[in-house]
Amino acid sequence: MSFRNLTIAAIAGAIVSTTALVAPASAQEEGIYVPLLTYRTGAFAGSGIPIADGMHDYLTMLNERDGGIGGVKLIIEECETGYDTKRGVECYESVRAKNPVVVNPYSTGITLQLIPRAAVDKIPVLSMAYGLSASADGETFPWVFNPPVTYWDGASVFVKHIAEREGGFENLAGKTVGLLHLDAPYGREPIPVLEALAEEHGFELKLYPVAAQDMQNQGSVWLNIRRDRPDYIYLQGWGAMNPTAVREAIRTGFPIENMIGVWWAGGDEDARAGGADAAGYKALSFNGAGTDFPFIQDVITHVHDKGLSQFPRERVGDMLYNRGLYNSMLIAEAIRTAQEITGKSVVTGEDVRRGLENLNVTEERLAEMGMTGFAAPLNVTCENHSGNHDVFVAEWDGEKWTVGQDWTEPMTDRVRPLILAAAQEYASANAGWPERTEPCDN
């Protein structure tokens, strides 16, 4: 395990140390402790690094520009998981005693291990657009949050997108849709929704799992894809799997415009791997790319210009870096909301759980934060812990991400009943799963 105390100004460009740097007890007492479970090493580092830096840099910007949140500094500390579930749980055990106000596992596998712990330890789990889709049911999972959107919502937007391209849902009958996915809990998440929509609309669903050890060697999988000739591919990949899939699609002649990635398959390095031939590749997204937003200019001024970031200045605005910024905005808004609800300056995990459950990021609030056009409004409630945020389809133009299809609402009428049923199934399968006793503030 490796830790970084990020309340101390980081040396620009420094290599992340494997030595634990723990905030002094006095700082722990005076600040709000926000641990970040990250991965800067291993096969998933290409995706993990920009997100880790984005999360760190937004929180650091709040410390530098505003003195923290509500006058209280944020104590930011990283723990390296390597995207490994066992190491992730070890990280959680290491930070748990320091009274974190929220935990971001940044791995579906780690999230699944922490879900049963959250209510016991009184530490909310924020699995931003990842984790267990069923945890969007706040009645069953009062301590787990997955805003702004679930994997099941994303799969429904993908189907909605291809239906629009085909001229209507009725024209999906007889089509073949492939799910190219990491053979892990994360990669398998969209299968139930895709199966349900395939049955409803008459398309055939083909599954193409990729083992973690084969992420950079997908030749056999793409032989199967060439044999089956699916009309569309939904890419639920991560780390080194994504750029490899883009290159393989181009190499085998699969129409790149017909491969659409989930939001975690929409990194700049993912698309850039295909060179000019990757133009037309698409991925779902819920945050903007680029630097043309006032809050990102604040990150540049208060973090990068002061040498407090490890992320290359020229890559600020990359899609996944911006997603890390967005993730930390949710953390910060939950803390701010918790302060408003409780009247406290230094809040606890129990307080921030209430803050997450009352997140209401309006257009006006987005404008106040300098995020107009960067994200859609978000409203989390006691019943709905994801918010069913709109999603847009981003398209790679050969150099950068553009908006290929405007903000699209998930098929909530189809997805929500499946989420509620899956939540009840989870509770039934876990003997003694507690009934919700937490009061509702909305």
Language-model segments: what does each one mean?
Residues 29-33, 46-53, 65-138, 147, ...:
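Beta-alpha junction/loop-to-helix N-cap segments that form part of ligand/metal-binding clefts
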Residues 87, 133-134, 142-253, 290-297:
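Extracellular/periplasmic Venus flytrap/periplasmic-binding protein
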Residues 15-25:
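C-terminal segment of classical bacterial N-terminal signal peptides
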Residues 81, 125-127, 132-136, 213, ...:
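Venus flytrap/periplasmic-binding-protein-like
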Residues 95-108, 126-128, 176-181, 229-239, ...:
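Periplasmic-binding protein-like
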Residues 308-321, 332-406, 410:
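Segments of small-molecule ligand-sensing domains
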Residues 31-56, 79-86, 107, 180-189, ...:
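Extracytoplasmic "Venus flytrap"
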Residues 249-327, 408, 422:
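Extracellular/periplasmic periplasmic-binding protein-like sensory domains
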